[in-house]
């Protein structure tokens, strides 16, 4: 019996280790999970390859004040939590499964605009300084301390010397690894239907990358996956009969937006509201899989060492 128990532990650890190794090997190839923020103040989760198969809506609850709603969302690189900012300029963490909101801080400067880009600067976040970038369709440009709500008001957004707005914003190389992250920021301007880039977000000067190729409204969600720099946008195309939004891939070299599919719930694209924000969900780092693997192998080793023969 003792030998059987020992062998069972060893076999279980071996099988589990193989499973974890296989998961780690296949994870990068799988489509990213995306969390969307709807115009009805709810969260929805879907696979980037099948946006029509969204989860049931999780309506956001727990916001302070009356008739408040979340305007934009992003996943923080250093802790993997989902953050959002409300219409009364308060910062929250959000539970994507339940919609429950937990207040973090009041922003020291009020938001100015009707559409917002909201993204964490991965370099600043790993260095523990003001890391949250908030930009708006009025050209507002804020660097926010996501722990305290402190705000550094920075230069208004411009391109070619002309004022410009931003309805979506996303940093490339957005991960918690100092060896691979960067401060390059892309923004989408729905007024010009263009993609812009800056390597110095605080200066506010943007370079035109290219046209999206679509006439969009101000209802835009935009994010770039940290694992492979795949860029996604939730766009609502102006002048369409449905007024619905869909998931688009964004070419960061040309600016071109290519439709992946309409948003839907459980395959029904007739019942999903447009998205005004989205973020690529946090995924375990390769190091996490390595730790899991080491732990499971250690379990087998301990079982062999401690069980009496």
Model-derived features with residue positions:
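Structural signature of eukaryotic scaffold interfaces centered on beta-propeller domains
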Residues: 71-78, 110-128, 164-181, 218-228, ...
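Short, threonine-centered small-residue motifs that mark membrane-proximal processing/anchoring sites
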Residues: 9, 18-20, 27-31, 277-296, ...
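Beta-propeller fold detector
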Residues: 53-64, 102-108, 150-161, 197-213, ...
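N-terminal segment immediately downstream of the Sec signal-peptide cleavage site
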Residues: 31-70, 76-79, 251-265, 278-282
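Structural motif
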Residues: 42-45, 90-93, 139-145, 192-199, ...
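Short loop/turn segments that connect beta-strands within beta-propeller blades
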Residues: 48-51, 95-98, 146-149, 200-203, ...
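Conserved beta-propeller blade signature
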Residues: 33-37, 81-84, 131-134, 178, ...
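C-terminal membrane-anchoring or membrane-association module
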Residues: 301-309
């Amino acid at each position: 019996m003792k030998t059987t128990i020992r062998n069972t532990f060893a076999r279980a650890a071996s099988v589990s280790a193989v499973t974890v190794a296989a998961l780690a090997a296949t994870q990068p190839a799988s489509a990213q999970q995306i969390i969307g923020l709807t115009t009805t103040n709810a969260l929805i989760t879907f696979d980037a390859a099948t946006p029509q198969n969204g989860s049931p809506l999780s309506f956001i609850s727990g916001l302070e004040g009356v008739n408040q709603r979340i305007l934009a969302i992003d996943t923080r690189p250093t802790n993997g939590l989902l953050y959002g900012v409300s219409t009364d300029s308060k910062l929250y963490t959000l539970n994507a499964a339940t919609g429950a909101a937990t207040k973090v801080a009041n922003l020291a400067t009020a938001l100015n605009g009707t559409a917002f880009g909201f993204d964490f600067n991965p370099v600043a976040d790993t260095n523990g300084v003001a890391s949250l970038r908030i930009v708006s369709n009025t050209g507002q440009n804020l660097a926010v301390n996501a722990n305290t709500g402190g705000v550094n008001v920075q230069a208004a957004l411009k391109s070619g010397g002309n004022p410009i707005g931003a309805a979506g914003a996303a940093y490339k190389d957005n991960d918690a690894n100092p060896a691979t992250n960067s401060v390059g920021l892309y923004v989408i301007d729905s007024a010009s239907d263009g993609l812009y880039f800056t390597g110095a977000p605080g200066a506010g000067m943007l370079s035109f990358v290219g046209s999206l190729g679509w006439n969009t409204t101000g209802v835009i969600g935009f994010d770039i996956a940290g694992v492979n720099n795949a860029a996604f946008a939730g766009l609502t195309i102006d002048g369409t009969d449905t007024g619905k939004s869909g998931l688009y891939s964004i070419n960061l070299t040309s600016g071109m937006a290519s439709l992946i599919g309409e948003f839907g719930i459980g395959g029904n694209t007739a019942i999903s509201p447009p998205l005004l924000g989205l973020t690529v969900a946090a995924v375990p780092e390769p190091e996490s899989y390595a730790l899991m693997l080491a732990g499971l192998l250690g379990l087998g080793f301990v079982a062999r060492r401690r069980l009496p023969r």
